[in-house]
From Swiss-Prot:
Span of the annotated motif PRPP-binding: 109-121
Keywords from the UniProt entry: Glycosyltransferase, Transcription, Transcription regulation, Transferase
Function comment: Regulates the transcription of the pyrimidine nucleotide (pyr) operon in response to exogenous pyrimidines. Also displays a weak uracil phosphoribosyltransferase activity which is not physiologically significant.
NCBIfam families cross-referenced by the UniProt entry: PRK05205.1-3 (NF003547), PRK05205.1-5 (NF003549)
Native species: Mycobacterium marinum (strain ATCC BAA-535 / M)
Pfam families: Pribosyltran (PF00156)
Cited PANTHER family: BIFUNCTIONAL PROTEIN PYRR (PTHR11608:SF0)
Protein name: Bifunctional protein PyrR
EC number: 2.4.2.9
Enzyme class (EC, first level): transferase
Length: 187
């Protein structure tokens, strides 16, 4: 995805304003689908997949709190040691897993990632989540779904569906990590 502040050449898919509107829309969808204000609603926990999934989870939690008045726990779930490509790709630094104080047992956990592609990161996240606790159910929220699934994975909340070629890359940029918001596609 590139290091912080790396310029990514390519075609802009989403501007900063588009990213903001899309995150707002996903937050509204989560509020509606989970019935957060219902007494029967399970506790909702957003767990971002590092790096940009953590930023997205934090922004979603802030938006949900602003729109519903309900504070949603959020954290980070490192999947590095659960990846199935550890031997074929350069080593990655371990990220910190941050589980909210209430844990994930019997909660509705929404895994959050920036881009859904093959589905392998989501599979790794499910494996990592199993070692953390036993949620009531698990859903998936992504900013961009670019297709080309290798595993039977489907997001419950999608900001934008973007058909891509396998030779293309989708780069999500957030100001907290990259200096600005946007989504770019490049070859």
């Amino acid at each position: 995805m590139g290091a912080a502040n790396d310029a990514v050449d390519g075609r802009e898919l989403m501007s900063a304003a588009d990213v903001g509107r899309t995150i707002s829309r996903i937050a509204h969808q989560i509020i509606e689908k989970t019935a957060l204000d219902s007494p029967d609603s399970p506790r909702v926990v957003l767990l971002g997949i590092p790096t940009r999934g953590v930023i997205l989870a934090s922004r979603l939690a802030a938006n949900i709190g602003e729109y519903s008045g309900i504070e949603v726990d959020h954290g980070a779930l490192d999947i590095t040691l659960y990846r199935d490509d550890l031997m074929s790709k350069p080593p990655r630094p371990l990220e910190e897993t941050e589980i909210p104080a209430g844990g994930v047992d019997d909660a509705l956990v929404i895994l959050v990632d920036d881009v859904l592609y093959s589905g392998r990161s989501v599979r790794s996240a499910l494996d990592a989540l199993r070692d953390v606790g036993r949620p009531r159910s698990v859903q998936l929220a992504v900013l961009v779904d670019r297709g080309h699934r290798e595993l039977p994975v489907r997001a419950d909340y999608v900001g934008k569906n973007v058909p891509t070629a396998r030779s293309e890359s989708v780069h999500v940029q957030f100001s907290e990590h990259d200096g600005h918001d946007g989504v770019v596609i490049s070859r």
